[in-house]
């Protein structure tokens, strides 16, 4: 299908479901007004469905690329009204499987050998089929039971074509719709572009799975299947076959005698462990991707699959998020506002008092509920919606995190309705903050950064000299040069004094921490030579800088 044919197909579906009623025709420029007035809307009576259901059915009819886009939009309640977001949550990826002969051809081309040589057994009937790939059961020559994920043929071309049209429509909305500049539709499509292209590379998914498996090796919380890298390529992924009960099958879990409270609390612990310990989290934890190992019903274990979408948080984002959540539950709305400004999530010129008042208006009603009924995910959602009114830039990593948290909460309360997320999460957050900003955190930071500082310190005089020469040659008057040089020297001296004081404070904190340990003397004697060398080098830099 050509791009023009596809565009007409999209327009036809829009007409069929009367999506014209969503558009602010009065705000459109004259050419677009004429187009919409001449379009054959009158041939289609308005369906007796809610606007959310009409949008959902239209996206399903347009195919897998639009379905996936709708699924992502369902988590963006800062962009869509609640009723439409709820309807989009029901979107189903209804894609028929492609013939097994095609799957075999892709496997043989990718792995360079016949399927009969690669596998002792290969099921021609797919276990599951989705928009991007389908999965077959197989057995390796060594007897290992595996699943083989095969990329759908031609999917890259389909995605490229539909994304081009999405960018076109988003660009028109951003240019001609009054809300377009605030909601950044082009940015939304760009985020989706990045997400869906990540899913097209099965080697990337395999790498994500390997990282998560390493992070949770021997963990009692969750099991990640191993990847067979000898059989994995960009279009083919071979992974250990797992056995468990789907987490959404609550009757089966109850019949197996699973402790539902423990299972729900483990889900919360898994989420916070990924976000704050590892800064690497499975960002597609919907019920279809989670199973439960019930071999020990009193202490059940999660099993995760489908690692195409993962999220990461920078250390600063981790810190601001943890401090935001802790400040929220202390009802310290001023700190919440200040943290948003300090993090750069909202512009620095934002008025703290106004922002604090807006946050209070949103958050106070939440505290009228029992703690067990407070939703972290909806808190973040309402907070981001409020921040958008103050020109908060879209933070893709936080959008992924909020979506994942909503999934985790939904699962947890489906399993155990009285789940109190705060009592489960608070100790984790407070412990993480103590480790990050306490003496041990300072010493760890010093250990990580001191070698780099020592390596760069010999270059500092030359850098300062070069900067001064550049100022001298830039053309100001001699008096201006002298004033600038004097100011720079004073700033340099102040910086050196602060650096020395900070270093001394770190050493004293480290000494206090070491001194509090049993057998401190023996511990110091056992320190490796390189540790003493680093400390001696740092002291030398201090003495040299103090002259």
From Swiss-Prot:
<dbReference type="InterPro" id="IPR004147">
    <property type="entry name" value="ABC1_dom"/>
</dbReference>
<comment type="similarity">
    <text>Belongs to the ABC1 family. UbiB subfamily.</text>
</comment>
<dbReference type="GO" id="GO:0006744">
    <property type="term" value="P:ubiquinone biosynthetic process"/>
</dbReference>
<dbReference type="GO" id="GO:0004672">
    <property type="term" value="F:protein kinase activity"/>
</dbReference>
<keyword id="KW-0418">Kinase</keyword>
<dbReference type="InterPro" id="IPR050154">
    <property type="entry name" value="UbiB_kinase"/>
</dbReference>
<feature type="binding site">
    <location>
        <begin position="127"/>
        <end position="135"/>
    </location>
    <ligand>
        <name>ATP</name>
    </ligand>
</feature>
<dbReference type="InterPro" id="IPR010232">
    <property type="entry name" value="UbiB"/>
</dbReference>
<keyword id="KW-0547">Nucleotide-binding</keyword>
<keyword id="KW-0997">Cell inner membrane</keyword>
<keyword id="KW-1133">Transmembrane helix</keyword>
<dbReference type="Pfam" id="PF03109">
    <property type="entry name" value="ABC1"/>
</dbReference>
<keyword id="KW-0812">Transmembrane</keyword>
<dbReference type="GO" id="GO:0005886">
    <property type="term" value="C:plasma membrane"/>
</dbReference>
<feature type="transmembrane region" description="Helical">
    <location>
        <begin position="523"/>
        <end position="543"/>
    </location>
</feature>
<feature type="binding site">
    <location>
        <position position="149"/>
    </location>
    <ligand>
        <name>ATP</name>
    </ligand>
</feature>
<keyword id="KW-0067">ATP-binding</keyword>
<keyword id="KW-1003">Cell membrane</keyword>
<keyword id="KW-0472">Membrane</keyword>
<comment type="pathway">
    <text>Cofactor biosynthesis; ubiquinone biosynthesis [regulation].</text>
</comment>
<feature type="active site" description="Proton acceptor">
    <location>
        <position position="284"/>
    </location>
</feature>
<dbReference type="GO" id="GO:0010795">
    <property type="term" value="P:regulation of ubiquinone biosynthetic process"/>
</dbReference>
<protein>
    <recommendedName>
        <fullName>Probable protein kinase UbiB</fullName>
        <ecNumber>2.7.-.-</ecNumber>
    </recommendedName>
</protein>
<feature type="transmembrane region" description="Helical">
    <location>
        <begin position="502"/>
        <end position="522"/>
    </location>
</feature>
<dbReference type="InterPro" id="IPR011009">
    <property type="entry name" value="Kinase-like_dom_sf"/>
</dbReference>
<comment type="function">
    <text>Is probably a protein kinase regulator of UbiI activity which is involved in aerobic coenzyme Q (ubiquinone) biosynthesis.</text>
</comment>
<dbReference type="GO" id="GO:0005524">
    <property type="term" value="F:ATP binding"/>
</dbReference>
<dbReference type="InterPro" id="IPR045308">
    <property type="entry name" value="UbiB_bact"/>
</dbReference>
<feature type="domain" description="Protein kinase">
    <location>
        <begin position="121"/>
        <end position="501"/>
    </location>
</feature>
<keyword id="KW-0808">Transferase</keyword>
<keyword id="KW-0831">Ubiquinone biosynthesis</keyword>
């Amino acid at each position: 299908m050509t791009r023009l044919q596809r565009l007409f197909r999209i327009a036809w579906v829009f007409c069929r479901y009367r999506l014209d009623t969503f558009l602010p025709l009065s705000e459109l420029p004259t050419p677009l007004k004429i187009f919409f007035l001449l379009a054959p809307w009158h041939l289609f009576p308005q369906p007796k469905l809610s606007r959310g259901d009409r949008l959902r059915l239209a996206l399903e009819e347009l195919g897998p690329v639009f379905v996936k886009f709708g699924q992502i939009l369902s988590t963006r309640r800062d962009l869509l009204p609640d009723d439409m977001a709820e309807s989009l949550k029901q979107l189903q990826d209804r894609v028929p499987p492609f013939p097994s002969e095609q799957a075999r051809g892709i496997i043989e081309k990718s792995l360079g050998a016949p399927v009969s040589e690669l596998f002792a057994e290969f099921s021609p009937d797919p276990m599951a089929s989705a928009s991007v790939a389908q999965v077959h059961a197989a057995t390796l020559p060594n007897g290992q039971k595996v699943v083989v994920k095969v990329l759908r043929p031609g999917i890259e071309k389909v995605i490229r074509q539909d994304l081009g049209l999405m960018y076109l429509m988003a660009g028109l909305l951003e240019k001609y719709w009054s809300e377009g500049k605030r909601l950044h539709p082009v940015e939304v499509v760009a985020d989706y572009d990045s997400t869906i292209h990540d899913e097209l590379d099965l080697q990337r998914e395999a790498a994500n799975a390997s990282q998560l498996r390493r992070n949770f090796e021997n963990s009692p919380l969750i099991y990640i299947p191993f990847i067979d890298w000898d059989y994995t390529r960009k279009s083919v992924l071979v992974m250990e076959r797992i056995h468990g009960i789907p987490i959404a099958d609550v009757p089966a879990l109850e019949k197996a005698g699973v402790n539902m409270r423990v299972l729900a609390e483990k889900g919360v612990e898994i989420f916070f462990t990924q976000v704050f310990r590892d800064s690497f989290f499975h960002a597609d934890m919907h019920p279809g991707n989670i199973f439960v190992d019930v071999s020990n019903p009193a202490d059940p274990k999660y099993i995760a699959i489908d690692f195409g979408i993962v999220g990461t948080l920078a250390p600063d984002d981790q810190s601001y998020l943890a401090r935001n959540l802790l400040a929220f539950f202390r009802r310290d709305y001023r700190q919440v506002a200040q943290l948003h400004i300090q993090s750069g999530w909202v512009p620095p010129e934002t008025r703290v008092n106004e922002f604090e008042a807006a946050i209070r208006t949103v958050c106070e009603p939440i505290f009228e509920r029992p703690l067990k009924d407070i939703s972290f995910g909806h808190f973040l959602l309402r907070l981001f919606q409020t921040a958008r009114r103050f020109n908060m830039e879209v933070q893709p990593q936080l959008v992924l995190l909020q979506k994942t948290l909503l999934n985790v909460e939904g699962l947890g309360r489906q399993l155990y309705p009285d789940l109190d997320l705060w009592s489960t999460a608070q100790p984790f957050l407070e412990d993480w903050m103590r480790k990050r900003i306490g003496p041990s955190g300072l010493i760890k930071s010093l250990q990580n950064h001191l070698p780099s500082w020592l390596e760069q310190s010999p270059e500092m005089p030359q850098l300062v000299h070069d900067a001064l020469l550049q100022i001298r040659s830039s053309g100001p008057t001699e008096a201006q040069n002298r004033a600038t040089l004097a100011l720079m020297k004073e700033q340099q001296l102040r910086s050196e004094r602060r650096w020395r004081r900070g270093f001394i404070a770190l050493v004293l904190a480290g000494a206090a921490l070491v001194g509090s340990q049993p057998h401190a003397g023996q511990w110091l004697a056992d320190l490796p030579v390189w540790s003493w060398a680093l400390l001696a080098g740092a002291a030398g830099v201090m003495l040299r800088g103090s002259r």
